[in-house]
């Protein structure tokens, strides 16, 4: 019998909107309770509310230990300087037990740090979630898929279930640790997993890579000159426990070394690895860093992109490709089809999903199930989307294993300190008159091409170039991108730019002292490593996407000079006054505000009035620019599509709603599409 990963041979796929957590947790109702403060409450860092909200005072004596504990059991909501807000959810408790915490561990530690008596409804909620969580594990071991039960009672519940019994393989065995174990058929793994959720015993997925002798080992270690930081080590310890590899997601800020975490995971497992990226540029950068940080040979690292279709010849190796290459369902070239057949026929010990927040999008959902693999590691800086589909990661990949605090890493010098500035640009009278009478798409482009915004962008570029800094300018709209870049004489990269040309422009930006400004479309949002950049100017964006705001900020967080005394990077957002841009700008900033960043609003830049700006100063030039927008085709008015197809669709619906064309709930699912857990949660929030 040919072995294969559980995602290749399954016959039943998970349905959208399916409950991902046990019924007990999803049906729990938080009951209001009076807060009862302890006598020694001033010395304790936590205030625990009856609705699952936990407030952390960062200035108390035990704040550091309490923070480490909360990261393990709760979801961070907001983390400004002195007071943090967390929320306990079924997902966060699922993640807690997956890394070894027990019910009593959670309750006793929560009580020790709490200012008040932990509400009874929270105690019941934790018990309901955790008493059955972590009691079953799906383990790939010795060429078989085994379900391990923690106790005889749990074993009897599982084997006594009619549906699970039907899906079992012949025979029941005990492993060396005397756990109760039974084997399940390879083609039924997903059905068993879903059934365990339905009967209140969600499984933790693990890969016993040390005892996997069937898969050839990969000769790969970290180079002696490479050292990992403390927070990277902590995140990896969450993944590798009990001498096995857990599937899950690690959340680190942009520039904090997510790639090195992934490479270290490869070196630990030492089995064939497949890495999924968002673009061809990130494929090249992943390959460069794998070879720079590890001892693996170049022949063992292959690429599968539109321009390179390689297959390593060794028994074990690394394949780096893009989500799009795997998700493509159209006709392929003979060469690409040959690589796809080889890829599908190969067993992968580890699948790394870079920028994992894109995986739940409609075009990528099938990627995870297209390849035979035994362990999944998701990497991202922003576990947030505008369409609620981030919830699906718990089903597609696994629980969140670790999430770092952006401000902590900034204070330690691991990522740069940032000054965030929102610059309000007056609309010229002629542009604003047309803005009021146009359809939503053309209004949006008019606000982007506002001559005052053009002049502000030119002023900021000249100012920071004079300081010897490298500048990135972002625009989602391609018409604006080309117009700005060509008018200011700067290079630009967008969707149609070929892979070879992209790499050439990026190299010039990094190494040529004469090329100090680069214009990027959405293709630069993620996975492009430009540590030379220390200033970012955003002239247009993707509606209210919090994820995109954080990803773009991340392009300058890894600045090489971040540890220089007094050094900081600059993040400018240019907004046309009295337009929809002002509404969306506030929405976009929310994630970064929750991470402790502050935005300074400026209506007049210092020195701007005294500077001889060169672009669109005359009325004739401004009218010509206005005519360009008014005569632009519908295609030119569209923003460039991103990988987050579903998120983009949600925000377009929102734009139409605000324009009066459609009556929909913006960026959300219908009630029936939500997981049961979240239907109840949203109902409570509405009340």
Swiss-Prot record:
InterPro entries: ATP-dep_DNA_Helicase, ERCC3_RAD25_C, Helicase/UvrB_N, Helicase_ATP-bd, Helicase_C-like, P-loop_NTPase, XPB/Ssl2, XPB/Ssl2_N. It is found in: Nucleus. Component of the 7-subunit TFIIH core complex composed of XPB/SSL2, XPD/RAD3, SSL1, TFB1, TFB2, TFB4 and TFB5, which is active in NER. The core complex associates with the 3-subunit CTD-kinase module TFIIK composed of CCL1, KIN28 and TFB3 to form the 10-subunit holoenzyme (holo-TFIIH) active in transcription. Keywords: ATP-binding, DNA damage, DNA repair, DNA-binding, Helicase, Hydrolase, Isomerase, Nucleotide-binding, Nucleus, Transcription, Transcription regulation. One of its GO terms (cellular component) is nucleotide-excision repair factor 3 complex. A motif (DEAH box) lies at residues 354-357. ATP-dependent 3'-5' DNA helicase/translocase; binds dsDNA rather than ssDNA, unzipping it in a translocase rather than classical helicase activity. Component of the general transcription and DNA repair factor IIH (TFIIH) core complex. When complexed to CDK-activating kinase (CAK), involved in RNA transcription by RNA polymerase II. Also involved in transcription-coupled nucleotide excision repair (NER) of damaged DNA. In NER, TFIIH acts by opening DNA around the lesion to allow the excision of the damaged oligonucleotide and its replacement by a new DNA fragment. Residues 636-648 have a biased composition (Acidic residues). Residues 677-687 have a biased composition (Basic residues). It catalyses: Couples ATP hydrolysis with the unwinding of duplex DNA by translocating in the 3'-5' direction; ATP + H2O = ADP + phosphate + H(+). Belongs to the helicase family. RAD25/XPB subfamily. The keyword S-adenosyl-L-methionine does not apply. The keyword Nucleus applies. It is an enzyme of class 5 (isomerase). SMART domains: DEXDc (SM00487), HELICc (SM00490). Its EC number is 5.6.2.4. CDD domains: DEXHc_XPB, SF2_C_XPB. Residues 239-401 form the Helicase ATP-binding domain. Residues 455-609 form the Helicase C-terminal domain. This is General transcription and DNA repair factor IIH helicase/translocase subunit XPB. Its main location: nucleus. Residues 636-687 are annotated as: Disordered. ATP binds at residues 252-259.
């Amino acid at each position: 019998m040919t072995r294969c990963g559980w995602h290749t041979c399954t016959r039943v796929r998970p349905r959208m909107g399916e409950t991902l957590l046990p019924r007990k947790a999803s049906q729990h109702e938080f009951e209001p309770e009076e807060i009862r403060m302890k006598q020694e409450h001033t010395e304790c860092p936590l205030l625990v509310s009856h609705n699952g909200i936990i407030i952390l005072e960062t200035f108390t004596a035990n704040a550091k230990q309490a923070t480490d504990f909360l990261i393990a059991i709760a979801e961070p909501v907001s983390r400004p300087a002195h007071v943090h807000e967390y929320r306990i959810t079924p997902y966060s408790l699922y993640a807690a037990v997956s890394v070894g915490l027990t019910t009593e561990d959670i309750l006793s530690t929560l009580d020790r740090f709490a200012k008040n008596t932990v509400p009874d409804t929270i105690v019941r909620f934790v018990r309901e979630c955790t008493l059955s969580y972590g009691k079953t594990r799906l383990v790939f071991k010795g060429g078989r898929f085994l379900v391990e039960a923690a106790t005889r009672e749990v074993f009897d519940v599982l084997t006594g279930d009619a549906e699970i019994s039907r899906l079992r393989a012949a025979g029941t065995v005990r492993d060396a640790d005397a756990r109760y174990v039974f084997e399940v058929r390879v083609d039924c793994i997903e059905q068993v997993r879903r059934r365990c959720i339905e009967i209140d015993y969600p499984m933790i997925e693990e890969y016993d890579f040390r005892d996997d002798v069937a898969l050839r080992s990969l000769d790969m270690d970290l180079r002696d000159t490479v050292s990992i930081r403390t927070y990277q080590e902590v995140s990896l310890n969450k993944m590798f426990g009990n001498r096995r590899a857990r599937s899950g997601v690690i959340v680190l800020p942009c520039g904090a070394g997510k790639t090195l975490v992934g490479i270290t995971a490869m070196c630990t497992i030492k089995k064939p690895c497949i890495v999924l990226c968002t673009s061809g540029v990130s494929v090249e950068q992943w390959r460069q860093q794998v070879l720079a940080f590890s001892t693996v040979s170049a022949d063992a690292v292959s690429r599968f992109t539109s321009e390179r279709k390689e297959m390593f010849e060794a028994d074990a190796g690394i394949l780096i490709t893009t989500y799009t290459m795997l998700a493509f369902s159209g006709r392929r070239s003979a060469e690409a089809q040959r690589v796809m057949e080889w890829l599908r026929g190969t067993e992968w010990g580890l699948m790394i999903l870079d920028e994992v927040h894109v995986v739940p999008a409609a075009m990528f959902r099938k990627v995870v199930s297209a390849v035979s693999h035994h362990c999944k590691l998701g990497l991202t800086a922003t576990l947030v989307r505008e369409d609620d589909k981030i919830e699906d990661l718990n089903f597609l990949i696994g629980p969140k294993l670790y999430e770092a605090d952006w401000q902590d890493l900034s204070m330690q010098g691991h990522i740069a300190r940032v000054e965030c500035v929102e610059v309000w640009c007056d609309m010229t009278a002629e542009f604003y008159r047309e803005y009021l009478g146009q359809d939503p798409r053309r209004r949006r482009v008019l606000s982007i091409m506002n001559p005052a915004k053009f002049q502000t962008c030119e002023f900021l570029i000249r100012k920071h170039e004079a300081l010897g800094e490298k500048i990135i300018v972002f625009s989602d709209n391609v018409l604006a991108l080309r117009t700005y870049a060509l008018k200011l004489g700067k290079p630009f990269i967008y969707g149609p730019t070929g892979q070879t040309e992209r790499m050439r422009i990026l190299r010039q930006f990094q190494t040529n002292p004469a090329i100090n400004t680069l214009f990027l479309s959405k293709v630069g949002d993620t996975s492009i490593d430009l540590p030379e950049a220390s200033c970012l100017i955003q002239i247009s964006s993707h509606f209210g996407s919090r994820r995109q705001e954080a990803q773009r900020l991340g392009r300058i967080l890894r600045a090489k000079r971040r540890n220089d005394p007094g050094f900081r990077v600059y993040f400018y957002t240019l907004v046309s006054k009295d337009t929809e841009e002002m509404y969306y700008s506030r929405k976009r900033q929310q994630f970064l505000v929750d991470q402790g960043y502050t935005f300074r609003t400026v209506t007049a830049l210092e020195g701007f009035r005294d500077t001889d700006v060169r672009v669109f100063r005359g009325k004739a030039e401004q009218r010509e620019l206005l005519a360009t927008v008014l005569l632009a085709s519908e295609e030119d008015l569209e923003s460039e599509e991103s990988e987050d197809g579903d998120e983009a669709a949600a925000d377009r619906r929102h734009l139409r709603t605000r324009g009066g064309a459609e009556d929909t709930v913006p960026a959300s699912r219908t009630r029936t599409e939500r997981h049961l857990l979240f239907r109840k949660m949203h109902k409570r929030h509405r009340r």
